Amino acid sequence: MSDLINIQQKLLPDVLAVMQKRYQILRSIYFAEPVGRRTLAGMLGMSERVLRGEVEFLKAQGLIDIASSGMTVTKEGLIVFRDLEGIMNQLSGLHSAENRLAELLQIKKCLVVQGDSDITPWVREEMGRVAVKQLDLALVEKRNVVAVMGGSTMATFADTMPSDFAKGRELLFVPGRGGIGEDLDNQANTICDRIATKTGTKHRVLYVPEQLGEEAYQSLMKEPAIQEGLRLVQSANAIVHGIGDALTMAKRRHTSDEVIEKITRLSAVGEAFGYYFNEQGEVVHKVSTFGLQFEDLAKIPHIIVVAGGTSKAKAIKSYMKSAPENTILVTDEGAANMLLNGSKAHLK
């Protein structure tokens, strides 16, 4: 296939350019549907006149429907869109970028989706879909315990989970941390419940605050139900989690001004599992959290990290210096370009 594409690029470059353009239009309609022509033209940076001709072609081929509510992708269009993904990624250089990024970060695998989630919110949805596929490939055992962390990216991950995900497997989704006091929709408990409801699988909850003082932590740890919940979470054979911007996460946790001043002074850029990292990957602050700890990752065979957007590049870089080598990163072009163009040497 790659040889054929190389030949086509030399003999029929115009044909490939048209195919790429129509793929981008189809892709944009799929993620924004139902979408009007004016909105779509703005998203693609294309004039309405040029776009009109292209969408009429796609409609004539039965790939999209056009209604008063906007344009949507048909079942046939979705098949074509999925079939073209690999080819388009090769043409755009994404496969090469994925390999270089995995080597740079010294992790198992990187998957890069087109776009920048900072600019185009639905790129996050595509990252979620790719993460779901990677989790599906990882869960080869008959029985699996999957830990899921909280956050808006994980909420999107849950939304992209198909109803038939279990496929005969016994799956138990567990929250990687407590969550009382956090935005309900983005709590790990809520996300696990949503996934289990969609897929007809089981889930457990951790109804404790994510952050605890030492005395409260030790008191709760004496409770048998709490001990059992933590043992279950720590038995996970797969985990899906995000990476946060340091200051954003600190403010979301209602962190004191004193601690915010500290992590700012120590140049923290990324956060995961309550650990705050600077650009060199050094831990500059740690919050006592209830649930999985960073060191627990060493015992988990399958680790999928979902984080994207140009603004997250520094956070991703800082975290990956300490990430286990079996980590799979799902990101977007915005973050990938910043990481590849801004780095001259290995990160670890």
Show the residue positions of the predicted features.
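Gly/Ser/Thr-rich loops at beta-strand to alpha-helix junctions
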Residues: 47-48, 146-157, 180-181, 244-247, ...
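ATP/nucleoside-binding phosphotransfer catalytic cores, i.e., glycine-rich phosphate-binding loops
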Residues: 9-17, 32, 52, 76-77, ...
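Gly/Ser/Thr-rich active-site loops/lids in small-molecule metabolic enzymes
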Residues: 253-282
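HTH-adjacent hinge/linker in prokaryotic transcriptional regulators
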Residues: 60-142, 159, 165-166, 184
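Short Gly/Thr/Asp-enriched flexible loops that form oxyanion-binding sites at enzyme active sites
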Residues: 153-165, 251-259
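Ligand-binding beta-strand-loop-alpha-helix segment within the catalytic cores
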Residues: 99-109, 168-245
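Basic, Lys/Arg-rich alpha-helical nucleic-acid-recognition elements, primarily the DNA-binding modules
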Residues: 1-87
